[in-house]
UniProtKB/Swiss-Prot annotation:
Transmembrane segments: 35-55, 116-136, 149-169, 175-195, 277-297, 308-328, 372-392, 406-426, 441-461, 478-500, 512-534, 543-563
Protein name as catalogued: Autophagy-related protein 22-2
Keyword Membrane: yes
Gene behind this protein: atg22-2
Role: Vacuolar effluxer which mediate the efflux of amino acids resulting from autophagic degradation. The release of autophagic amino acids allows the maintenance of protein synthesis and viability during nitrogen starvation.
GO terms under biological process: amino acid transmembrane export from vacuole; autophagy
Region (Disordered): 1-23, 214-259
Top-level taxon: Eukaryota
Organism name: Aspergillus terreus (strain NIH 2624 / FGSC A1156)
Glycosylation: residue positions: 239, 300
Length: 591
């Protein structure tokens, strides 16, 4: 009872009908963490390991050799020991030592010859495009009304079921498998944008921050009149946004602007929650990845083994979504008002129209948000480097170091374990060294730069004669994968929370959509350039030079980001957008 009274005392008054200003509860935080535990396995275990292999193998089982365009690819693969040679291609061994790994296979799609490896890449490209469309279209509904949680749960259920459906897809229906992959990856990306949009709200309503504002004698929602005075104001006059971070210039106690060297309490809390979420997701991914490796090995490493693993990944995602669905509060945003009275049949059309018009308007106005532009440009290059280094390293290990699939699986496990360690340890390091969030990100970039530089050492004649160092031996991939995972753990948590500090308050979903689109869209370019370099020189090692440049480019951009200026600009833009945010929706569109 005493805790309830304390909670009631620090709860700020609502700013619009349906506003949930209850302090963030421990159960709500557990619900937020549980979705990271549920869904992170998809991006690590499925997208990072088994989904591309499954798509390529299913297409291969239905394809023909490129050499003669008549011999089925499945005929060139040996069945595992103890199986009948009359079994279908669905039980073909994937990594038999007798299999001609260099033989290229093609499938015919709409009359075009498509390489089976390209089929997986095209599938992911389509999913990224569809994902971007969905993320933009739903951002209006996520920012307004009570749809944020509904959309999150819907995307989670559709994505997890689509992943589980691989268990029923036969190799001759590989296009259907590609469709399931598009749906699953699209829903995963959309759900994580929605999950990220909850983070500033959880921080803003956290009891420790509400208590701090109360002790300071200020409203947690900014400098607002008391509720008794606001009761007679019209809804249009109420500022419905509650900033994640205060402006930092002054407060009711006349405190001076926070020191540049100090990290705000809000950002510390946001970083802590974000880091915990990333770490919990990585722990889940490590556990399930090990389970998946055991399943594949003990089921003779067939195409069915991979489909079974994808079913397990989808089942994990599905089951652990329910705690989030039960415990995560909707936290509705201010409703959109319709000029014609708000007919329900027009509401979703209005939300979609609002989202696209808002995106265009916001994209035009972000030119005034210098620090968000600098950060997004840096993140565009950095996320491209992250995705490209991962794929390039695996391809390098397979083609030039002749590492077996089991060894490649261990590389992924080591990277994930290092990611867990990094997600939890970077906050400690930054606290001990008194680093701001931007400085921690810069430290991660510098450490990340060591990965391609180490690969370039193999060009130095003196080192080349040693026979090791510079990625000349398979064992060198393991410590390098630890460095990669350590960097990913820091970048994943700090970039997300740091970007949240620069977002205009009240527009979290829309700006996190830009964050996600920047993240996903950038990964098209790096792999293509690495492929061109590999075709030009006949080996992958020269591509490490390109990767070194790609990772280094974000560094000067990140150094230019000024968080205090960014917060002031975000507050100003939020005030400007507030005038258009209350425009009524007429005939499903915004005027």
């Amino acid at each position: 009872m005493q805790d309830d009274e304390i909670t009631e005392n620090i709860q700020p008054p609502p700013q619009y009908p349906g506003d949930d200003t209850r302090p963030t509860s421990k159960k709500e935080l557990v619900g937020w963490y549980s979705y990271g535990w549920a869904a992170e396995v998809f991006t690590v275990c499925a997208m990072g390991s088994f989904l591309p292999i499954t798509l390529e193998q299913m297409a291969r089982d239905s394809g023909v050799l490129l050499a003669d365009k008549t011999t089925p690819c499945s005929a060139t693969w040996k069945t595992p020991q103890g199986t009948s040679p009359t079994l279908s291609a669905d039980t073909t061994g994937l990594w038999s030592s007798q299999a001609p790994r260099t033989s290229q296979c093609i499938v015919h799609i709409l009359g075009a010859e498509i390489n089976t490896a390209s089929f997986a890449m095209y599938t992911f490209s389509v999913s990224v495009f569809v994902q971007a469309i969905l993320i933009i279209s739903m951002s209006g509904a996520a920012d307004h009304g009570s749809y944020r949680k509904i959309l999150l749960v819907a995307c989670a259920l559709i994505g997890s079921i689509s992943t589980m459906m691989f268990i029923a897809v036969k190799p001759n229906l590989y296009i259907l498998g590609g469709l399931f992959a598009v749906v699953a990856n699209t829903c995963f990306g959309a759900s994580f944008v929605l999950l990220n949009s909850f983070l500033p709200l959880l921080v803003r309503h956290h009891p420790s921050l509400l208590a701090k504002h109360r002790q300071a004698g200020a409203s947690p929602n900014g400098d607002r009149p008391p509720a008794t005075h606001r009761a007679h104001r019209t809804e249009d006059e109420v500022n419905v946004t509650t900033p994640l971070l205060p402006s930092g210039s002054t407060n009711t106690d006349g405190a001076t602007q926070e020191s540049v060297s100090d990290t705000s309490l809000e950002l510390k809390l946001s970083t802590k929650i974000s880091s915990n979420g990333i770490g919990i997701g990585y722990i889940a991914a490590v556990i399930l990845q090990i389970i998946c490796i055991v399943v594949v090995v003990n089921t003779n490493q067939t195409t069915f083994s991979l489909r079974l693993v994808l079913f397990l990944i989808g089942l994990w995602w599905f089951i652990f979504t329910f705690p989030a669905a039960l415990w995560l509060r909707p936290r509705p945003g201010p409703p959109l008002r319709y000029a014609d009275g708000g007919k329900e049949r027009r509401s979703w059309l209005g939300y979609i129209a609002y989202a696209w018009k808002s995106l265009g308007r916001t994209a035009m106005r972000t030119r005034h948000l210098k620090d968000i532009l600098l950060f997004l440009a840096s993140w565009f290059l950095l996320s491209d480097g992250i995705a490209t280094v991962s794929g390039t390293a695996v391809l390098f290990a397979k083609t030039q170091l002749d590492m077996e699939p089991a060894a490649l699986g261990m590389i992924n496990v080591i990277a994930m374990m290092a990611g867990v360690f990094g997600a939890f340890s970077w906050s400690y390091v930054s606290r001990v060294l008194n680093l701001r969030a931007s400085q921690t990100i810069i430290a991660c970039i510098i450490l990340f730069e060591l990965v391609p530089i180490y690969g370039l050492l193999g060009f130095i004649p003196a080192i080349k004669r040693l026979g090791f160092i510079g990625l000349q031996q398979p064992w060198e991939m393991y410590p390098l994968s630890f460095v990669y995972g350590l960097v990913m753990g820091g970048l994943s948590s700090y970039c997300r929370s740091f970007f949240g500090e620069l977002i205009p308050p009240g527009y979290e979903a829309a700006f996190y959509a830009l964050y996600a689109i920047t993240d996903k869209g950038s990964s098209i370019f790096g792999p293509a350039i690495v492929g061109a370099i590999t075709d030009r020189y006949g080996e992958i090692r020269p591509a490490f030079g390109f990767l070194a440049i790609l990772i280094l480019l974000p560094l000067p951009l990140m150094l230019l980001v000024d968080v205090d200026r960014g917060k002031r600009d975000a507050q100003a833009l939020s005030a400007e957008l507030e005038g258009t945010r209350d425009e009524p929706v007429a005939d499903g569109s915004l005027e």
